[in-house]
Regions:
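Core catalytic region of metal-dependent phosphoesterases/phosphodiesterases
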Residues: 3, 8-94
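Acidic/histidine-rich helix-loop elements
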Residues: 4-8, 32-33, 111-125, 201-207
Length: 249
């Protein structure tokens, strides 16, 4: 299960939990709005959504939010390894999750968050630098992961095109940020964006749907299909659109 952009809307989590129970859950950033300590309480709820829950930060998050998530039991990934509740990073950048190799890159703006008025977007020059940095980071990873989490869909798209230029490369990239459900494929590189689990914020509950995705993997780890799911946060009623990926591109 893949979700992102909760934006402190804890009211949507019970509906998502009906689908995620006893499955690995990948949460691709933006647990908060401002990254404040008060919002960090959402992290404790999110950490128990999956078995396990794997997470990276988004541009609305902060160190205190991500450390709270780690302290509640989630696998919080950074470019250098796994984040601990005390803020230290340890271990390999590539971890094993349910038989799959997974890596994640934190959002650069998360380090500046935690107070009102922090920046929420990169300049064009910063975005170009970030895509170059993430591409170089991926190229240096060993072993090569099956799945990469990166919050900003623009960075994810650049990484998809970069990796697809390699002969025989296969990778699933999980992303978010744009609040739009989509699946994009270049060769054997698949990018999945589940939309926004936050459903437009607390005040839109009952009017906006929670979006997330279910990735159906074949025994060799390749995604056979992706279900893009839209659920009512109150009733749990849902609809899904299936994207088949088991054909040769």
């Amino acid at each position: 299960m893949v979700a992102s952009d909760i934006h402190a809307n804890w009211l949507t989590l019970p509906a998502f939990a009906r689908y995620s129970d006893h499955r690995p859950v990948f949460l691709v950033g933006d647990f908060a709005l401002q990254g404040t300590p008060i919002e960090a309480s959402i992290a404790q709820r999110a950490a128990t959504l999956g078995h396990p829950t794997v997470a990276v930060s988004g541009n609305h998050d902060s160190p205190v939010v991500m450390q709270s998530l780690a302290g509640a039991g989630a696998i919080v990934l950074t470019h250098a390894g796994r984040l601990a509740a005390d803020g230290t990073v340890h271990g390999s950048a590539v971890v094993s999750v349910d038989g799959l190799l997974v890596a994640g890159y934190e959002d650069p703006l998360a380090s500046q968050a935690g107070s009102l008025g922090h920046r929420l977007d990169l300049t064009p020059a910063e975005l170009a630098d970030e895509t170059t940095t993430v591409e170089a980071w991926f190229d240096a990873l060993f072993p090569r992961p099956d799945i990469v989490l990166v919050h900003d869909f623009r960075v994810a798209e650049a990484l998809r095109l970069h990796v697809a230029a390699e002969d025989g490369a296969r990778l699933i990239i999980l992303t978010g940020h744009d609040h739009r459900q989509h699946v994009d494929r270049t060769g054997d590189i698949v990018e999945v964006d589940g939309g926004t689990l936050g459903a437009g914020g607390v005040f839109a509950v009952g009017h906006a749907s929670a979006g997330f995705a279910e990735v159906h993997l074949m025994p060799d780890g390749w995604p056979a299909a992706v279900d893009l799911i839209s659920a009512d946060p109150i009733s749990g009623d849902a609809s899904a659109r299936r994207i088949a990926l088991d054909e040769t591109p």
